[in-house]
Amino acid sequence: MYPLLFRTVLSRMDPEDAHHLASTAIALLPSSGFGWIARRLTAPDPSLAVDALGLRFPSPFGVAAGFDKDAQAVLGLGQLGFGHVEVGTVTAEAQPGNPRPRLFRLIEDRAVINRMGFNNGGAAALADRLRRLRSRRDRPVIGVNIGKTRAVAVDDAVADYVRSARLVAPVADYLAVNVSSPNTPGLRGLQEIELLRPLLTSIRDAADGVPVLVKIAPDLQDAEVERIAELATELGLAGVIATNTTLSRADLRTDAAVVEAAGAGGLSGSPLAPRALEVLRILRRALPAESCVISVGGVETAEDVQARLDAGATLVQGYTAFLYRGPLWARSVNAGLVRIRRTR
């Protein structure tokens, strides 16, 4: 049913409008009377539970940052079967992001190009919303992805990130430090070790014991990935999230003119899968066994998720395929994981 809805209705809508429609519907799910039905239909099998970051995740499969920037649909996403939700990216100051249009589908590639620019309502508002969710027993694990406020100079980035961390860490299950979005000028430069060390040290201290992970780009050289893994280990971080979106447009099936018309931005979805898997393997070799590695990028099926777990991922996230697979995506992945494991 959803593929028909996507082909005939959603694919003809502006992608950002379609996203708002879907996320609003998910946000309303818990209060609609259908939430308990959804939970009964989509609850992950207990055999899928994962212990990581000092937490119990009901499934290894969760929602990547970007889908629910302001934590408005967390409970609904949990009721759809996701084991965790990474909200954000949130910045210390509220900001509108880049001008629209800023989200583009590449349907032939099951991919998306975005240049959203960290549009969000700010860390203080997010913290207030999460504070109200903390006591809910039916909530999923909630990570908070923090980034740099666009108006803040790179030289002042540490103080900006620390401000966000202090606001959201008390109400987060873990923090993800986003230094890898291509849509905020100067942000990816923070992945350079001499800049990353003081940033991560300060955020770790501000988090006051809440697990901290750093999210990296797929466009790093292998040696750079290894150096970041070494730094994360040295600083006692909980782990690494890999990867964010890519600037590459190589090997796409979509007409080149369509891709060019979309313009600048990060590409996510199926084309990212090979590099995301490569980076995962590098990280798993470079990090201690106890470090958490969250793999994201090009994940769509249960087989994709299991392949990441087999390659050493602790947890797996997805987002782009949600647009193409619809609201029962997590249920399908979780059921598929159970089937795969029963045949082994």
UniProtKB/Swiss-Prot annotation:
Enzyme class of the recorded protein, top EC level: oxidoreductase
Q: Where does substrate bind?
A: K69, N114, R115, M116, G117, F118, N178, N183, N244, T245
- Asked if the keyword Membrane belongs to this entry, the reply reads yes
Q: Alphabetically list the UniProt keywords.
A: Cell membrane, Flavoprotein, FMN, Membrane, Oxidoreductase, Pyrimidine biosynthesis
Substrates-to-products reaction catalysed: (S)-dihydroorotate + a quinone = orotate + a quinol
Q: Which residues bind FMN?
A: A65, G66, F67, D68, K69, T89, N145, N178, K215, T243, G269, G298, Y319, T320
Name recorded for this polypeptide? Dihydroorotate dehydrogenase (quinone)
CDD domains the UniProt entry points to: DHOD_2_like
Database matches in SUPFAM superfamilies: FMN-linked oxidoreductases (SSF51395)
